[in-house]
From Swiss-Prot:
Subunit structure: Homodimer.
Consequence of gene disruption: Embryonic lethality when homozygous due to embryo development arrest at globular stage.
This protein's name: Malate dehydrogenase, chloroplastic
GO terms of biological process kind: chloroplast organization; defense response to bacterium; embryo development ending in seed dormancy; malate metabolic process; protein import into chloroplast stroma; response to cold; tricarboxylic acid cycle
Organism of origin: Arabidopsis thaliana
EC numbers, comma separated: 1.1.1.37
Amino acid sequence: MATATSASLFSTVSSSYSKASSIPHSRLQSVKFNSVPSFTGLKSTSLISGSDSSSLAKTLRGSVTKAQTSDKKPYGFKINASYKVAVLGAAGGIGQPLSLLIKMSPLVSTLHLYDIANVKGVAADLSHCNTPSQVRDFTGPSELADCLKDVNVVVIPAGVPRKPGMTRDDLFNINANIVKTLVEAVAENCPNAFIHIISNPVNSTVPIAAEVLKKKGVYDPKKLFGVTTLDVVRANTFVSQKKNLKLIDVDVPVIGGHAGITILPLLSKTKPSVNFTDEEIQELTVRIQNAGTEVVDAKAGAGSATLSMAYAAARFVESSLRALDGDGDVYECSFVESTLTDLPFFASRVKIGKNGLEAVIESDLQGLTEYEQKALEALKVELKASIDKGVAFANKPAAAAAN
């Protein structure tokens, strides 16, 4: 049976690992999308309706047929959602579509939207969507504590967007201060929540968040995640296009970091197994690494990769919620505190459970090709510099960090 990835349908297919190997196999979740004419979001169900006419439903029905031949019981969502999610930066280019996608989740009971301005309109708009979760808006620092009260998952896309000619590192000073301030509030108001960092540069903002949490005495490395899912989504998409494969079958692990050469797709570990020429490996690797710039240039100054980032982040949020809800087979790639290399943080496939990070998939770094091994050694230098930059920023006196 061909393996499948959770990338193509973030809320319908998840990766799991068989006991015999570290190779992921698809697991269908019990989710139903209504057909487009009467779309009402995601619904908990035991089977995809045979009368559903949307193309997505047809795809899911095909997946159900495959799943029914498996000896694994599909994971079922709770009928009554019970998780609170806060999006910090909800009025931004990523925050708005991300909030919409999270609003569709059957696991979310309450969606808190925070920003320094313009968030009331976003909340009003989303509140008209007839999905179960209730939407509340919070504006400005004075309302941030209330936004974070009793939240289970905090998602942070806040920050300035990339512009043509701007690298992720150019964003550092502005976004570093934003992340530092927001994570301080998280530490004070919901220290046990899962924290998802989207704000770039992730290679530095995650270490900043870790240092802030340490200073507050509430750091739990199992609950701090740098969201690198977009790199996996892109790798799966580009490989499926290059090799004319069904996207739902493709799974490419991506390790390292979340900027430039620190993004390393392990094409040799692509599932299903695919043969690449040296030229294809080079072409795909470079395209995946520079995909963000590809979008920035295409938008000609009008924005960055907001929609694909929102999609990827929503997938990661959904995975975290499933883990909190008791699904024991949740795997994603993420930039986390790790002992996989000699670096303190590293992106790789991880297992997520009720209490956060449960395991780092060590097999990701085993059996690498010569090309991948050289790329790994090369990325470590740049990644270490970014991590050190984040740690140094977090430990600056407040006045110096603000400059």
